């Protein structure tokens, strides 16, 4: 029998869910209008008042919010509660090197844990499980999100954080982990490392919870077949609540969105009209109960489709498909958002023999993302001794690692060797077959 953490909500009829969403939308719109000058101004520009929003069907009258709006109002411009009521902030890298900050009230943190716990329940986990978390802990939402979820579930969490694969394997084996959570690329690397060490039969694993970067069904099947487990796709974004916005169940027929807290729309990116079920468009979220930084119609730039039919598991929550891409050129590398503009800014800041002509190449090696940046440098550089070339390469790699938050391989090339484009420059070659 499929375990459902909150059947009242997760199996609610569409009419009941719409009534709950309507009640929450009316409340959140009034709150942002009264407390967030940014939203008040945006709504006034559209000639919309809180009284015009009577139900969830009126959501199309409201303005969009974008990542740029978050950046322009950094750090606390979109706060809807007094700063003293903020329990914590989480963050993610932005295009300008400034973080995208997401403040949380204590209730927001509790809701976050509850949503992740619903997902862990979809993965068949209970308070008897031991969940090994190898997502990074810190401003990045991965580690803490899974930790809060394990706590809400009553399970034991092992807060390993990222890196040191041998130690990860030792802890998983010695502590008897029954589930592990990390990016899919690291999950595959870890699975193969466990296999090579002959430890598959020593493990008690039954589930993997993986997200923070796009991955294919082929990759899922590979991890599952090596470790003899079920792997689940978890989705979230720091601005909305980190992991736990949506997750798939054992039927793996789309990710269930916790639509009582996060109202999903899938819209045609050009016309902003709603897409029919099954039609691909941009995913847009409205947070229905967030206290600290509610977001209205936040454009995620993730491309997906939506399905409102009831799942075989009995849940009526809408399901979104695996992501087919993004509407912009951002790349997710080892769970970190990397923008070509960040590379450009970093190279320009160095000046000297370095030209702002570059190419980012993303590969998968041993199932881990590897970012190589080709950088054009002055011809004179190549007449220098090898030691000087290595020093320059290391210097650029250091600057890029600081700017991007991921380590980078740097390849120095001669001027004009990177192809120029007439139109929009091709800055990224992604060989990962995602």
Regions found by a protein language model. Name each.
Residues 1-91, 96-114, 118-122, 203, ...:
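Nucleotide 5′-phosphate-binding alpha/beta core
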Residues 1-8, 65-232, 240, 244-250, ...:
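Active-site phosphate/ATP/adenylate-binding loop shared across adenylate-forming ligases
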Residues 9, 256, 322-326:
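Short, flexible turn/loop "capping" segments at secondary-structure junctions
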Residues 38, 48, 125, 199, ...:
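Helix N-cap/coil-helix junction residues
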Residues 160, 234, 267, 363, ...:
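Conserved beta-strand termini and adjacent loop/short-helix elements that scaffold enzyme active sites
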Residues 180, 289-404, 423:
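AMP-binding/adenylate-forming catalytic core of the ANL superfamily
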Residues 203, 258-261, 326:
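Short, solvent-exposed loop/turn segments at the edges of secondary structure
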Residues 215-310:
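Conserved AMP-binding/adenylate-forming
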